[in-house]
A protein has these predicted regions:
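Cys/His-rich short segments
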Residues: 339-397
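Phosphate/pyrophosphate-binding loops at sites that engage ATP/ADP/AMP, CoA/4′-phosphopantetheine
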Residues: 50-64, 203-221, 240
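Short nucleic-acid-contacting surface segments enriched for D/E, G, S/T with interspersed K/R
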Residues: 435-449
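Short aromatic-glycine-enriched beta-strand elements
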Residues: 408-420, 461-465
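Condensing-enzyme catalytic core mediating Claisen C-C bond formation in acyl metabolism
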Residues: 1-43, 139-196, 200, 276, ...
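Conserved catalytic cysteine-centered active-site region
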Residues: 24-28, 32-45, 72-125, 235-267
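Conserved hydrophobic positions within beta-strands
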Residues: 398-400, 433
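OB-fold/S1-family single-stranded nucleic acid-binding modules
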Residues: 450-472
Length: 472
């Protein structure tokens, strides 16, 4: 039976207090905080983080597909899934696809992955949902939105979560949308949108699921329920007859915010972190219709506890000191023109060195075992020529050997910290440090690698691996 074999999650390091948002606009923005992607993060980089977490300790050769779900892919015309697959070091002989333009894209991708495995077209399929939505300043969405990602490995062996039943329907109802070329979201009057849209649609889907399988709220250990906001979440929980104190998964509104297509998947990851064998979960996602699933947790859940998931990332955070820092990260203002030549890129170089850039492959000398980056023809230790094998470095941790700080660099967050990292197992890597406190950078600091968007030279996103302090 096809089901969830593994899971992973990601929440950016930075948080923005809703109190700061309210002070910026002299209004009330609610309680709690929302997650904020760093200036070099987007839905693709966060998706890779979730995939890395999901695949922790697993072989990748059996994966036959990757489906990427998002309403904010970095390219309007260019597949994101193929880049995520390369950065995640998946085999080239896989099927990739993007699912987009709907908040329900995450469960849509999951359903197709389940069908793919059931049909025998792939042994395993990796599904990742990630969103990095930007709300209009001083809008109702600005304090509500958050950034994050979740990933699930779908397979038919060592299944940790069985798909015991499902119900879905499509709807053309308009609630939140963006037109072609628009950055910010539109919506209609709240009572109409919620009463005729979310509330009515979810109630219809869950009632149909209960009737189809002969179940009631008492048959479930946990309800994982998508909602547009906390108020409507509480309303529908009551309407469906679930106990809000004992049966309902916390919806992350006060700690992360609404993460778009990744919102329901991230809540499911949080639920699975606490799930025990024998638990039964009702998983409901909404957006242009409804997907509802009955999930059964097996004993295999105990074998995938070593994930950072949601709990670890919730505890690992850094508060933005000002609202203006968020404005800078999101590029919400027109800035003074830079007095320097523009960033440039070379597609031939990016293609020729793709294994070193996206997959972060170094080479290991077959004669002496020395690991080296970037790949070169001659071993720097024993001088053996053209006798090496490529090795993956992206999942290695390391220590800072030396570093420098540039206070005049043209980056959104000064200083620009450059370092040389000694990787565990061998290899030395020259890169930038992100998600950092400059005052805490020191020689010997433990770091890990993360893929980020270095710049947008020549009209394309230039992704590369950076160092960051290990999130603990």
């Amino acid at each position: 039976m096809a089901g969830i074999v593994s899971y992973g999650g990601y929440i950016p390091l930075y948080r923005l207090s809703r109190e700061l948002i309210g002070k910026a606009w002299m209004t009330t923005a609610g309680l709690g905080e929302r997650s904020v992607a760093n200036w070099d993060e987007d839905s693709l980089t966060m998706g890779v983080e979730a995939c890395t977490d999901c695949l922790n300790g697993r072989e990748r050769q059996a994966i036959g597909g990757l489906y990427f779900a998002s309403t904010t892919p970095p390219y309007r015309e260019k597949q994101t899934a193929s880049i995520v697959a390369a950065a995640s070091n998946l085999p080239r002989e896989i099927f990739t696809a993007d699912f987009t333009d709907s908040i329900r894209a995450g469960t849509s991708a999951m359903q197709v992955a389940i069908d793919t495995v059931k049909a025998g077209s792939a042994k395993e399929v990796l599904v990742v949902a990630s969103d990095c939505r930007t709300a209009a300043p001083n809008s109702e969405f600005e304090p509500l939105f958050g950034d994050g990602a979740a990933a699930f490995l779908i397979g038919d062996s060592e299944v940790a979560v069985n798909i015991e039943g499902s119900y879905t329907f499509s709807s053309e109802f308009m609630d939140v949308w963006r037109l072609e070329g628009e950055r910010f979201h539109r919506t209609w009057e709240d009572r109409f949108v919620q009463a005729e849209g979310y509330v009515a649609h979810v109630r219809e889907a869950v009632s149909a699921l209960f009737k189809k399988y002969g179940v009631t709220p008492k048959d479930f250990t946990k309800l994982v329920l998508y909602a547009p906001n906390a108020r409507r979440h509480n309303e529908v929980v009551r309407n469906l007859g679930f106990d809000a104190k004992t049966q309902v998964q916390e919806p992350l509104f006060n700690t992360v915010g609404h993460t778009g297509a990744a919102f329901a998947p991230m809540m499911l990851v949080a639920a699975l972190e606490e799930a025990k064998p024998g638990d039964r979960i009702l998983y409901v996602n909404y957006g242009d219709g409804v997907d509802a699933y009955i999930l059964g947790v097996t004993e295999q859940i105990e074998n995938i506890r070593n994930r950072r998931g949601i709990k670890h990332h919730l505890a690992s955070k850094s508060m933005l000191p000002t609202y203006e820092k968020y404005v800078r990260f999101r590029n919400l203002m027109e800035w003074e023109a830079e007095r320097r030549p523009p960033d440039i890129s070379s597609l031939p170089v990016l293609w020729r060195e793709r294994n070193q850039i996206l997959r972060l492959h170094g080479h290991k000398c077959r004669q002496c075992g020395t690991i080296q980056y970037p790949i070169q023809r001659v071993c720097t230790w024993c001088q053996t020529k053209d006798d090496f094998e490529e090795v993956r470095l992206s999942d290695k941790q390391g220590t800072i050997f030396t570093f420098s700080m540039d206070e005049r660099a043209m980056v959104p967050e000064l200083p620009n910290v450059i370092c040389i990292v000694d990787l565990e197992g061998g290899g030395r890597f020259y890169t930038r440090v992100t998600d950092r406190d400059p005052g805490k950078i020191e020689v010997g600091m433990k770091v890990e690698l993360t893929i980020r968007n270095m710049h947008d030279g020549s009209g394309l996103h230039n992704y590369f691996w950076l160092a960051r302090p290990i999130r603990s």
